[in-house]
Structures are given as structure tokens and as C-alpha cells.
Design a protein with these regions (language model features):
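Bacterial extracytoplasmic/cell-wall-associated proteins, especially those involved in peptidoglycan
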Residues: 66-192
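Primary recognition of N-terminal secretory signal peptides and signal-anchoring hydrophobic helices
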Residues: 1-80
Length: 192
């Protein structure tokens, strides 16, 4: 069975417990919900084939299996909490960006190789203030849970960024002096 929820304007759709990113948001055209074929194919477990020359697309139903959620429970638990604690009140893209930094660190040889390990890393001192002040243990906002799922699905909005900070809350002197600026999303600056 396929259960898909698409809210006009949202940057994601929910499919059988998964969150799938919709780059330009869920749109309404002529009174109907419009979604990219890539998202529909992923949601329904269909194979999508493009013919660039003809400008045509084919969806194959051979062995179609609707998407279902299968996120590593521990990764979802800690990723949603660090996203919530670090970016509560930020737009969804800003929350995804914070999650991207965590996952980029997991992939980097400079940091521990698990989400929990990155969150609680103290190699160069506590990395994230929510670990120091205990807000890491607060229940995550629902949007942070969605952002974590989107990150675990591979949604990436900050490239290979390994650092972020909020200029309104911190001078970020070390980051500004030692890393390359990438972008600003919401109240955070991101650095590679």
C-alpha cells in the first residue's frame, strides 16, 4: 500500500513514514497537486527512465514496491535531537543544513563515524552547545524529525560543509579564520 501526504508549499512529501524532498516545494497547478516525477517514482518504488532527446519519461511498474521507512533508529534519534536543539525556529532548509553538517562529519575521517559519536565528540572540546546545556535530551520538534529523515534520505543543501554557527549568538572566530564560507541559511552560516 502507498500512503502519500503532500501539503501545498511544503518542501517534502510523506510516504509510508518516509520524508522525500521536493526541491521547489509541493505545488498546485490548475487546482491539482503537482509533484516531480522523480519524487513520485521514489514514493511508489517505480523505475523512472528519461529520454532527453524526445523530452519523454517512462515509469516502469515491474517489481514496484512502495517506499517504506527504514532509518537507523539511533541515527534518527540523535540527528533529530541535535537538529532541534541547534536550529529550533529555523526554516526547514536551515534544519536540513544542520543535519547535513552532522552527516558530513560522520563521513569525514576527522570525526567519529556515527551520528551519536559526532554529537558527543569532545576531541577539541564540546562541539555543540546543546550537549553542554542538556537541551540535546529534549524531545525534538516535529519539523526536526522531518529534517532528519530528509538528511538520511540524502537531501543535501550545504555541500561538504563541516561547520556552522549563528553570528547572532557567537563570534565564530575559529570557523571564520580556519574554514571557507559556503552559504547562509536562516540564522546560520555554513563553512567547508
Amino acid at each position: 500500500d502507498l500512503e502519500l501526504t503532500a501539503t501545498p508549499g511544503a518542501l517534502y512529501v510523506e510516504v509510508n513514514g518516509r520524508a522525500l524532498y521536493v526541491e521547489h516545494g509541493v505545488q498546485v497547478r490548475d487546482g491539482r497537486i503537482a509533484l516531480p516525477l522523480e519524487v513520485l517514482a521514489e514514493a511508489a518504488g517505480l523505475q523512472l527512465t528519461w529520454d532527453e532527446v524526445e523530452g519523454a519519461a517512462w515509469l516502469s511498474t515491474d517489481q514496484a514496491q512502495p517506499a517504506s521507512a527504514s532509518y537507523p533508529a539511533e541515527d534518527l534519534y540523535w540527528l533529530s535531537r541535535i537538529i532541534s536543539a541547534e536550529s529550533r525556529g529555523e526554516p526547514l532548509l536551515g534544519q536540513i543544513a544542520v543535519g547535513n553538517v552532522i552527516l558530513n562529519r560522520v563521513e569525514s575521517s576527522q570525526y567519529p563515524d556515527t551520528v551519536e559519536g559526532v554529537v558527543f565528540d569532545t576531541k577539541y572540546g564540546v562541539q555543540f552547545q546543546p550537549v553542554s546545556n542538556g537541551t540535546i535530551y529534549d524531545a525534538p520538534a516535529s519539523s526536526s524529525l522531518v529534517a532528519a529523515k530528509l538528511c538520511l534520505e540524502g537531501t543535501d543543501v550545504v555541500g561538504e560543509s563541516l561547520y556552522f554557527f549563528s553570528p547572532a549568538l557567537s563570534a565564530g572566530r575559529w570557523i571564520v579564520s580556519n574554514a571557507t564560507y559556503y552559504t547562509t541559511i536562516g540564522g546560520h552560516q555554513f563553512y567547508v
